[in-house]
From Swiss-Prot:
Keyword set, alphabetical order: Hydrolase, Signal
Disruption phenotype: Not essential, grows normally.
Name this protein carries in UniProt: Resuscitation-promoting factor RpfB
Enzyme class: hydrolase
Cross-referenced InterPro entries: DUF348, G5_dom, Lysozyme-like_dom_sf, Resuscitation_pf_RpfB, RPF
UniProt family annotation: Belongs to the transglycosylase family. Rpf subfamily.
PROSITE patterns: G5
Keyword Secreted: no
GO molecular function: hydrolase activity
Gene that this polypeptide is encoded by: rpfB
Amino acid sequence: MLRGVVGAFLVSLTVAGSYAVASHKTVTLSVDGAPMTVTTMKSRVIDIVEENGFEVSDRDDLFPAATETVHQSDTIVLRRSRPLEVSLDGEGTKQVWTTASTVDEALAQLRMTDKAPAAASRGSRVPLAGMALPVVSPKTVQIDDGGKVSTVHLAAPNVAGLLEAAGVPLEQNDKVVPAASSPVVDGMQIQVTRMRIEKVTERVPLAPGNERIEDPTMNMSRQVVEDPGAPGLQDVTFAIAKVNGVETGRLPVANQVIEPARNGVLRVGAKPGTEVPPVSNGHTWDALAQCEAGGNWAINTGNGFYGGVQFDQNTWERNGGLRYAPRADLATREEQIAIATVTQSRQGWGAWPVCSGRIGAR
């Protein structure tokens, strides 16, 4: 008798254990797109969902259906509904319900994919408590993008959004009229000026420097290139400003020497007493030299007149020319102008009676 009771008890334990093992399962529960792994001994979809703390309303989407049986490794998907206060182009608001998690998904559910959110971005999450969703309808506008004109029919909350939707977003320092934040209206004309800074590297010559040697035997206004040196090569990076693709300026911002330049040698005059004052009214003296000597400051035809303004030897010497050169034709343009200025201050423009009149100097 006792042996029979014990046997029956063991059989019932075995059956109960087998049932528990068979009932225990691991499933995936996805709520509003967020999956989680749960273990359960429940069999119905609704029981597992509620067991994990989620309520299901008539507006929610639940798959499989609430009364369906769940098996090991199954997936349950719950998309909870949330209210939206939708208004179009700033007019009347109506409440709708959606199980979408993002604004973009909500517009798709509401069959409003041709509309655009006026405030939120398309990727914004829709909170479970709901949100206001003002949207705008498509508008027909003309875009002049740096001279390329096109007409588009798009929905966007403002000018910047419309340009982005059209595939030509504002970048860098681009300018747009009307302003980027302006609301889009039908028939609007948008003018875009593309302002770009581009970096370009070019290989260019590297100019040689000069070693200056002062020569006390040579007049101060003179210099002689003893050795011109040799240019090198460098890679220069320029920041190039462009307006609508047209270069408007460039500035070197970096360089790398590829081949160094060889410096030249410049011998400069340093002879005391040969200073030359700055040339004033140089265009007048050049015009006078053109009239007197065809513009040749070194002319000597043997007629007794020398240089660009045709000094005779007496005038050259009397007005201090010998400190520069024995004759005017052996002096530089600047040295001759210095002596001509002294001559003009003493004799007036009458020292050159014909040519001074022709050039309008008197």
